[in-house]
């Protein structure tokens, strides 16, 4: 239940601060794609269903609600929104995305991210939003999760990086790299992409 989760994270945090040599606090991260993935929290429709609304205000409010529920249990970081552009229908994670349109994904993703992060840092109600999955994760070869993305630079920049660019410009706190590779280079080690 949420109370047990909060109690456990508080105990870990207290230990890290009071009983370790450097006293560095732990940053707790939680999955928050369409609700905080924990017992006793609100579950919203998947991102693909949310996309049919085109409702930025609703996405902002949903982001706020998810952030509050995660913060009440001790989280500092929320994994979401998923900004992947999904154009491989065999991919098993399409429902985590807002679909195949970069403009729609950018619009709703930025609103969701802003709701999660809020206007004021450290207010106890918001957390850092983590944009997922950088980059071109929604077009895995043969639909296999984590498989390489066969994509040219023009399409990468015009479609697949567009939502991330908009969210970073709007103040996104963190980004999660994807598990795939582009042109044979894993995204997690792709110096060109990451810098």
Where are these regions (language model features)?
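Glycoside hydrolase catalytic-domain context in secreted enzymes
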Residues: 1-195
């Amino acid at each position: 239940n949420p109370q047990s989760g909060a109690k456990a994270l508080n105990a870990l945090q207290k230990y890290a601060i009071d009983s370790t040599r450097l006293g560095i606090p732990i940053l707790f991260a939680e999955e928050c794609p369409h609700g905080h993935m924990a017992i006793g929290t609100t579950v919203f429709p998947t991102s693909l269903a949310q996309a049919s609304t085109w409702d930025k205000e609703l996405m902002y409010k949903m982001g706020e609600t998810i952030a509050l529920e995660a913060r009440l249990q001790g989280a500092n970081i929320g994994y979401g929104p998923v900004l992947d552009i999904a154009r491989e229908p065999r991919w098993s994670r399409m429902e985590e995305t807002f679909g195949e349109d970069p403009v729609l994904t950018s619009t709703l993703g930025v609103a969701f991210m802003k709701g999660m992060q809020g206007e004021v840092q450290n207010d106890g109600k918001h957390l850092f939003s983590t944009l997922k999955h950088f980059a071109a994760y929604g077009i895995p070869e043969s639909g296999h999760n984590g498989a390489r993305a066969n994509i040219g630079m023009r399409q990468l920049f015009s479609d697949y990086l567009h939502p991330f660019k908009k969210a970073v410009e709007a103040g996104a706190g963190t980004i999660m790299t994807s598990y795939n590779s582009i042109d044979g280079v894993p995204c997690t080690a792709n110096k060109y992409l990451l810098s």
